[in-house]
Amino acid sequence: MKIAIYDIESTGAITEWSSIIEIGGVLIDENFNEIDRFNLRGRIPEGEIPQAKALLVNGTTIDQLTKSNLSNYMMLDQVERIFKKWSPAIFMGFSNINFDCEMIRKSFFRNLRYPYITNATPNKRHDALNIVRAAHAVDPKVLKTELNAKGNVSMKLESLSRLQGFDVSGAHTAQFDAINTFKILKLIKQKIKPNLWSSLLRTYSKADTETIFKKEKMITLVEYYYGKNKFHLCAPLHPKYCIHPVYQWGQAVDLRVDPVPLLNMSINELKVEMKKSPKFLRTIRSNKAPIILDAEQGMKFEPYNVMTSDLLNKRAELIRSNE
């Protein structure tokens, strides 16, 4: 399936009140050969006041903001035409699920366009940042990295691009960032095993993600918090009950925990236990392109690497079979 990598520059960081002022992208095939690319810039909608910090970050001048050839409406019209032409594809960017994708949805909605163009059938969506984090977690040598001010590995696009030897003179401009995202993903694909690359991509839709944890007895959930990657070897709940009834996200039990006491608890006792740290119940955000790897990956890391496979399988079976 083709991959459409795009990036957005906006008038602010709050997606509800900001507008797209520049968008660029590159379309590639499965072998990372470039098929097409584009870059568009539009004027700020009349009456909107941009955030000064946003303009400082993306380097947009007042002339660019107010005198571009395309109005915001005309720019979005061209974006829609390009995305339709590129379909079907996996749409992704660098940290796009929490920002770029939301900007597309809300901008399209305000302009009476179909807001789910990047992830509704026949398209899928993923997040390059999730892929980069997971690839680095499995093999820290896959990319050159540096530490940030907090002493954690920096996962910023500009930092990663510079350390791989890519040009960063145009960082924070749309097409430039899309191209550097493409280069980093290509480098990862070249360095890791083919089956790992497939695993990193397989959560590109909510339905595909749900199929994984409904069918598999054990999974490795790779999460990122407090600036670090964490591996959780988990067993999804019984297939009938593994999706939260309200939030519609997957639920799995961390196999570091003995499930027997949990199975014997009352509902009130479970509520108390669920608030304790570390959490025994892991949430799989099915529509956010989570990283789910094979169980063998999780077994390589503490504390699972000191637990026998028989014990892990027994715990997984207890969780999986309990209704």
Give residue spans per PLM region.
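Active-site-proximal helix-loop-helix substrate-binding element of RNase H-like nuclease domains
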Residues: 44-58, 62-66, 123-178
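Acidic two-metal-ion nuclease catalytic site recognized across multiple nuclease folds
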Residues: 186-315
